[in-house]
Amino acid sequence: MAAAPPLTKAEYLKRYLSGTDAGLEGGPEAGRKRRKKRPKPGGAGGKGMRIVDDDVGWAAISTAKPEKEEEEDGDLPVVAEFVDERPEEVKQMEAFRSSAKWKLLGGHGEDGHFHHDDQDSSPPRRVRHDTPDTSPPRKARHDTPDPSPPRKARHDTPDTSPPRKARHDTPDPSPPRKARHDTPDPSPPRRVRHDTPDLSPPRRVRHDTPDLSPPRRVRHDTPDPSPPRRVRHDLDASPPRKSHRNSSAVSPRRGHHGSLGTSSPRQTHNHSPTAAQHRRTLDSSGTQHLRRAHHESPDLELHKAKSSKAAERAPSKAASQSGLGPSHPSLSTNSKYEHDSDLSPPRKRQAKAHFEAKKQLDSKGVYQKASDSDLSPPRKKKNSGHQDSDSDLSPPRNRPRRQSSDSDLSPPRRRQRTKSSDSDLSPPRRSPRPGKKTAHMYSGAKTGLVTDVQREHQELKKQDQDTTDLGAQFEFTETVFRDKSGRKRNLKLERLEQRRKAEKDSERDELYAQWGKGLAQSRQQQQNVEDAMKEMQKPLARYIDDEDLDRMLREQEREGDPMANFIKKNKAKENKNKKVKPRYSGPAPPPNRFNIWPGYRWDGVDRSNGFEQKRFARLASKKAVEELAYKWSVEDM
């Protein structure tokens, strides 16, 4: 086939515009084609239907994300650290903490019992007491309207929604919630019972590693249709912590479910067999997910009135008399299954059994169960009467500090300002001795801080005095100089040695300077100076009887002198006894620039390269030119 001829820009534009017009004005055919391409809106049919699941929230997202990581990194070693994989949850937690709608209207009685009757406007939370809970803690009130998302009120049936405590003596104006617990819940998966279908994605739970995914409830007495997972109920991947014999709140992530201050989370206040059975189920299985209830908050103390105090003390006493006291069987047996499974750094393991619970009576006469058989980091014990004070050495966190200690990994909360808690964010301080009472002034102010300040001032003053004494001691001492090897240097001896060395160097330089100038020349110059001085002392007119002049004329040798041989013989006889070096006595040698006489063995042959002769010729010509120029300059005078 022949290639199509190339189109010009004008033809291409014309075809483009004509095609557009045809598409626009092509009639019903073009319209039908375009309508076929449009997606049909969702109707009653099954093909075009689009299902919008409004129930999917932060819980489902948080469940799905760690599952993928678990499946991929299931066999990798686990590092004990806080992994924030749920940004939406953190956002909702922050919104919940900063919200002004979360208030506690109930109070605690004088006997130390707490009422969980504050309203809960927070999103659902779950607390697993055998695995770390990374969700923020929430408080639940069961005698006031609960505007939170729907929850199931039955505690003896599987509940796939977050459990809540329910007060059955007041109406619940919250949104309707499911009443049947044997049907699947399309809401985000929370607790999982293996006798009901599990709509959540399959996940693995390893027994030897902490579960960083959102905690699930697992019933081990029924078959599990979901993929197999492993659950550890008492593994504590946190670092070992020293035991606190007098504290029940030594870790911010520990939940004591047997302590009176924290009755079983989310358990109801109707003292019916159903509630007792629910508590027994919690104690026996050890895996039921219950949401932690905060029993006291700063808002409670700020907003409760005197009337509310009086109104709620009676229910607290009634609750203590109806079987929720320290001797209640369900609470006493619940201490067996208090397991500390947080993800805090490794701690030292206690020497005692891990499941041993310690009971102590606080200052108000309330039983506290301090199951400190965990592996949290070592803290300093506060041995004063406050057994529920904050005595940990971990970074300060905002959290309630009553008998209910947290066993989750949720973000820090505000500290409750009770009488026995330290509500500031300063580093931990040393606790006073148990038998020592803090000193007070008559005005009631403590004197410990003043004493500490005075002690600091005294220490600083002592340091300054020591420094001053040290400076005065070595003020007039000489400086010790040392060489590289560390030996002391004597500067005086070094200066003397340097002076002697300088003198030696100067003498050697003078000697080399004489040798460089020439010894014979220097002696000849010295002789000439002496002769000149001697001639200067003579009178200006010299006569014929001058002895020096007569001797000089007699010693001269002249050619053709008949008496020359006779004179030589006489000199030889005279100098015979004297040791004189032999000297050249032949024909006159050619001159040289140093005027050196040849040796007595020279045979009279000039063996030089003629440099001396050329030099003298150049000097003679230069002198001749100067004389000629001078004569030309004075010729006209």
From Swiss-Prot:
Residue stretches spanning the membrane: none
Entry superkingdom: Eukaryota
Subcellular location: Nucleus
One GO-annotated biological process of the protein: mRNA splicing, via spliceosome
Descriptive protein name: BUD13 homolog
Basic and acidic residues bias locations: 108-119, 295-315, 353-362, 453-465
Post-translational modification Phosphotyrosine, affected residues: 512
Region described as Disordered: 18-53, 104-470, 553-595
Primary localisation category: nucleus
Record's function text: Involved in pre-mRNA splicing as component of the activated spliceosome. As a component of the minor spliceosome, involved in the splicing of U12-type introns in pre-mRNAs.
Ranges in coiled-coil conformation: 490-538
Residue stretches of biased makeup (Basic residues): 430-439
Subunit structure: Part of the activated spliceosome B/catalytic step 1 spliceosome, one of the forms of the spliceosome which has a well-formed active site but still cannot catalyze the branching reaction and is composed of at least 52 proteins, the U2, U5 and U6 snRNAs and the pre-mRNA. Component of the minor spliceosome, which splices U12-type introns.
Organism field: Mus musculus (Mouse)
Residue list for modification Phosphothreonine: 131, 144, 157, 170, 183, 196, 209, 222
